[in-house]
Regions:
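Basic, helix-initiating cap at the start of DNA-binding domains
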Residues: 1-29, 33-38, 55
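Short, hydrophobic secondary-structure boundary micro-motifs
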Residues: 31, 69, 98-104, 141-142
């Protein structure tokens, strides 16, 4: 029984990672068979873990929020840790493109996820900003919500324009934080 639970957890982790990669490559409408193939499992396993596409999207969203919130930034200076975290945040934003298509923005799930996102990521960003400001590496007047909103807005253009380089624009924004 314990082996089965370990296998189920491993399959779920593989599915979440595979779905996140598929969503980046093809959006949240990526075929379930492609996600299953990336994870090395059968299509039935996908549906056992996530009965609907919305369930899968919500799980990937939460998984990505947790990965961003719990990122290991040890050994990095304050500014380098902030810059690395923002890179991870951009990865998360790219993954979540199309969430509104899978979940209606007026649905309770959408509101709960947005609150979850803010509750988990704002404090992390705030701590990183405070550390970088205390180290004298960035200006001290930047608020976490402002920065996250700015990064998010810079990432929006990438969804519809393959020539749009959100990472470059975000890198310019982050460089502009320097004191």
């Amino acid at each position: 029984m314990a082996t089965r639970r370990v296998d189920a957890r491993r399959n779920e982790q593989a599915l979440l990672d595979a779905a996140a990669a598929a969503f980046v490559a093809a959006g949240v409408e990526a075929p379930v068979r492609d996600i299953a193939a990336r994870a090395g499992v059968g299509v039935g396993t996908v549906y056992r873990h996530f009965p609907t596409r919305a369930d899968l999207v919500v799980a990937v969203y939460r998984h990505q929020v947790e990965a961003c919130a719990e990122a290991d930034l040890t050994g990095l200076g304050a500014y380098a840790a902030l810059a690395r975290w923002i890179d991870l945040f951009v990865d998360f934003l790219v993954t979540k493109h199309g969430l509104a298509a899978a979940l209606r923005p007026d649905s309770p799930d959408f509101a709960v996820l947005h609150t979850y996102f803010l509750d988990r990521l704002l404090p992390v960003c705030a701590r990183l900003l405070e550390a970088a400001a205390a180290a004298g590496e960035i200006r001290a007047d930047v608020q976490a919500y402002e920065l996250m909103r700015g990064v998010g807005n810079l990432c929006i253009g990438a969804e519809h324009d393959p020539g749009y380089d959100a990472r470059r624009l975000v890198a310019l924004l982050v460089a502009g934080l320097r004191s």
